[in-house]
Every structure is written in C-alpha cells, then in structure tokens.
From Swiss-Prot:
One of its GO terms (molecular function) is transmembrane transporter activity. The chain crosses the membrane at residues 15-35. Belongs to the ExbD/TolR family. Pfam families: ExbD (PF02472). This is Tol-Pal system protein TolR. The Tol-Pal system is composed of five core proteins: the inner membrane proteins TolA, TolQ and TolR, the periplasmic protein TolB and the outer membrane protein Pal. They form a network linking the inner and outer membranes and the peptidoglycan layer. HAMAP family: TolR. The gene is tolR. Keywords: Cell cycle, Cell division, Cell inner membrane, Cell membrane, Membrane, Transmembrane, Transmembrane helix.
Length: 139
C-alpha cells in the first residue's frame, strides 16, 4: 500500500483577503467621517481679546439675534425690532445695494443657540453679503 502524502499546511498569511478587508474598512471610515464631523457639538471659548472694527467713520449695520427667530436690526442708529427672516434679508439687501462697502455685524445674546447665529449669517449671505463681523464683549 502506497501512502498518500497530504499537502503541507501553509503557515503564511494570505494577503489578498486581508487587503480586501482593509479596503472595506477604509471605505466605511471614509463614508462615516463626514457624518461624524457634522454632528459635533461646539463649546466656544470666551473672548479674551477683541478687535475694534472701523470703516471710515461709517455706521455699521448691526443684526442682533435676541432669541429663536427674533431679530432686530440697527441701520444708521435706527433700531427695528421684531423682524422676520424675509424682512432681515430685504433690509440687508437694500443697505448693501446702497453701498457695497457697508460693514455688517452680527451679535447674539448669550442664551441664543449657536444655530440661530448661523441662521442670521445665512440670511445675510442670501442678501448677497460676503463679509460679516461677529460682535463680542471683552472679558
């Protein structure tokens, strides 16, 4: 009787399936990374230094966010309160059309959610304004 020889067991790792698994993991991380970064909550630090803004002695247009959906705007020293989002966009566009070098500042109360300040910035962006300053109080 002839003895059959068995194939020797390979003790080395098979690279192809290993690379397949690694590539799938990389794809999963690439797909989930943008989702994770969009859901990060931010705690902003207090302002230790603030810089004064001057615009050739022009009075800036100040958009104040007093609460959720509560906006007030100061144009040339005249304050208008209780504005809707459409009114804010319209008034901002009118001031920007008069002089495209007008300085726009956005200020929010401490208790206003960060999302509302972003909405105010988006309203100014819809009005065609590309440069906006944020108001802070020095500590």
């Amino acid at each position: 009787m002839a003895r059959r020889q068995r194939k020797a067991i390979k003790s080395e790792i098979n690279i192809v399936p290993f690379l397949d698994v690694l590539l799938v993991l990389v794809l999963i991380f690439m797909a989930t990374a943008p989702i994770i970064s969009q859901s990060v909550q931010v705690e902003l630090p207090d302002s230790v230094q603030s810089q004064e803004v001057s615009n050739e002695d022009k009075v800036p247009v100040i958009l104040e966010v007093a609460g959720i959906g509560k906006y007030a705007i100061s144009i040339g020293g005249e304050r208008q309160e209780g504005l809707t989002e459409e009114m804010v966009t319209q008034l901002s566009r009118q001031e920007f059309d008069k002089d495209n070098n007008t300085l726009f500042l956005v200020g929010g109360a401490k208790e206003v959610p960060y999302e509302e300040v972003i909405k105010a910035l988006n309203l100014l962006h819809l009005a065609g304004i590309k440069s906006v300053g944020l108001m802070t109080n020095p500590i």
